[in-house]
From Swiss-Prot:
EC annotation from Swiss-Prot or TrEMBL: 3.1.3.48
PANTHER family: RECEPTOR-TYPE TYROSINE-PROTEIN PHOSPHATASE, TYROSINE-PROTEIN PHOSPHATASE 1
UniProt protein name: Tyrosine-protein phosphatase 3
Keywords per UniProt: Cell cycle, Cell division, Cytoplasm, Hydrolase, Mitosis, Protein phosphatase
UniProt organism field: Schizosaccharomyces pombe (strain 972 / ATCC 24843)
Hydrolase found in the keyword field: yes
């Protein structure tokens, strides 16, 4: 798939209204392209599997869906989660905000996906516009334990990142059969449903998580990211991560251009439906790219 989204002159995008018009055309094209995938890649779901979905119209593709490990002895191996590999090579698990019916399988997925230490990125508030968007799936009090069979989840620390008030970080310890794993949970609450967040805060957070994800403790684990449905905001985060990977890599042989964005989003959508869902989210990616190409500095937040 190839789009010529926005013309540039000296690395600067055309006016915002043109970007929005182009973004609308691209989203329309992506939606048409996705219809073909829906006809061939949707899984056949049992009633038990369907009960684990937050939204009936957002499900993983059969060829990219996460399957629960047989060690859990679940009657159904289904969870609403997709394995997504971005062009620069990093692997994500894009998933829905857990429901009361899927909290247990969510943590089982986390355990089986993370060798030693892992990262969860939460991009939705629990409630938005008076609607439940995500259930509380973690122990709330310090040192409280959530038990899921022989798997336990313990909250060991809560803190914020300096200069990013929208982010709360929780550290969990997972225990199973004497083996312990560390999970860092980044809760970003500055993103409106279907809209776009403040550029500085999300870009700074994404760059921080990108740096952390390549550190020795985390580099082999996929980044687990969710919003409510696990598509719009989740896809935008993954696209932003890829844009940063291309623009931050001084060794890259190919220069990043805004024309790459549509292909990045198309790649994501081929693995998780509706990744980057709205025109505003696509415009946000253009805006960030423009600021990066103009050399604007975004400092890493500190603990």
């Amino acid at each position: 798939m190839s789009f010529k989204e926005v013309s540039t002159e000296n690395g600067v995008l055309t006016p915002l209204i043109t970007i929005k018009e182009k973004a609308y055309m691209i989203i329309e094209g992506l939606n048409e392209e996705e219809i073909e995938l829906l006809n061939t890649r949707l899984p056949k779901l049992s009633k038990k599997a369907l009960a684990r979905n937050r939204y009936s119209n957002i499900v993983p593709y059969e060829n990219t869906r996460v399957r629960l490990d047989p060690m859990w002895k679940e009657a159904c191996d289904y969870i609403n989660a997709s394995i997504v590999k971005i062009p620069s090579g990093k692997t994500f698990i894009a998933t829905q905000g857990p429901t009361s019916n899927s909290i247990d399988v969510f943590w089982k997925m986390v355990w089986q996906s993370v060798p030693k230490s892992g990262i969860i990125v939460m991009l939705t508030k629990l409630r938005e516009r008076h609607r439940l968007k995500c259930d509380i799936y973690w122990p709330v009090e310090l040192f409280e334990t959530l038990n899921i069979g022989d798997l336990s989840v313990i909250l060991v620390k809560v803190y914020t990142l300096t200069s990013l008030n929208e982010v709360q970080v929780r550290e969990f310890e997972l225990n199973k059969d004497g083996v312990k794993k560390k999970i860092l949970h980044f809760y970003y609450n500055g993103w409106p449903d279907f809209g776009a967040p403040h550029t500085f805060s999300l870009l700074s957070l994404t760059r921080y998580i990108k740096s952390l994800s390549y550190s020795p403790d985390f580099e082999t684990a996929p980044i687990i990211v969710h919003c409510s449905a696990g598509c719009g905001r989740t896809g935008t985060f993954m696209a932003l991560f890829e844009i940063l990977s291309q623009t931050d890599d001084s060794t890259s042989t190919s220069k990043f251009e805004v024309d790459n964005i549509a292909n990045i989003v198309s790649s994501l959508r081929s693995q998780r439906m509706q990744s980057v869902q709205s025109v505003d989210q696509l415009v946000f990616l253009y805006t960030v790219s423009q600021e990066l190409l103009q050399g604007k500095e975004f400092l890493l937040p500190q603990l």
